[in-house]
A protein has these predicted regions:
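Catalytic alpha/beta core domains of metabolic enzymes, predominantly
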Residues: 110-111, 124-200
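Active-site beta->alpha loop and helix N-cap motifs at the rims of alpha/beta catalytic domains
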Residues: 1-126, 136
């Protein structure tokens, strides 16, 4: 009612995921209210979730934006103790070129030693990261380990899966296309509905 973060509900959700053997938690992703949180709220959420999980399962932390310098600054200066990897969305609204997307992720890769999961969701960002750009990033930066693919373009996803480096995974970013994507060779999903039905 007062528009503050319901931290108690968040902890109940974390406990629910742990009780139902979720493989890992994605914290501060873009499906949540992350874009409307203050920096202090984000830091508190990160701290609370890391403490609650206490190393039981890996934590994938959302660190992205359309201001490359701000993302790099966050990666260089924030404390990432307890974070296993970061999820970083394609820059939104600005509609960068494919070379611009590449340079954005190059800067991110060089700013951290943490594993990086790319996130392509053109329906939200306004620009699609093409297969050739994804593959170029995957080949050039060893700490880029996967992509959360939510373009909805099965041909594009299949192209990535067929041509990716061995140490790079494709993860579905859309519950509705998870099964066909797994049949092509994707390794799983970062799920929305899994928040409500983690066991299923």
């Amino acid at each position: 009612e007062d528009e503050s973060v319901d931290y108690d509900a968040l902890m109940r959700l974390v406990d629910y995921q742990l009780q139902n053997n979720t493989d890992f938690l994605c914290v501060l992703g873009t499906t949540a209210e992350t874009p409307t949180l203050t920096e202090d709220e984000k830091k508190k959420i990160k701290k609370m979730v890391i403490e609650r999980v206490n190393g039981k399962i890996p934590i994938l932390l959302g660190v992205g934006g359309n201001n490359t310098r701000a993302v790099v600054d966050t990666l260089k200066n924030d404390d990432f103790t307890g974070v296993d990897a970061i999820l970083s969305v394609v820059p939104y609204y600005n509609k960068p070129s494919q070379e611009g997307i590449y340079q954005h992720y190059k800067a991110i890769s060089e700013a951290t030693e943490l594993p990086i999961v790319l996130y392509n969701v053109p329906g939200r960002t306004g620009v699609n990261m093409k297969a050739e750009t994804t593959l170029r990033i995957a080949r050039d930066f060893k700490n880029v380990i996967a992509i959360k693919e939510a373009s909805g373009d099965i041909t594009q996803m299949d192209d990535i899966i067929k041509n990716k480096p061995a140490n790079f995974d494709v993860i579905s970013g859309d519950d509705g296309i998870t099964f066909p994507l797994i049949t092509l060779g994707a390794v799983g999903i970062i799920s929305v509905i899994g928040n409500a039905f983690p066991r299923e």
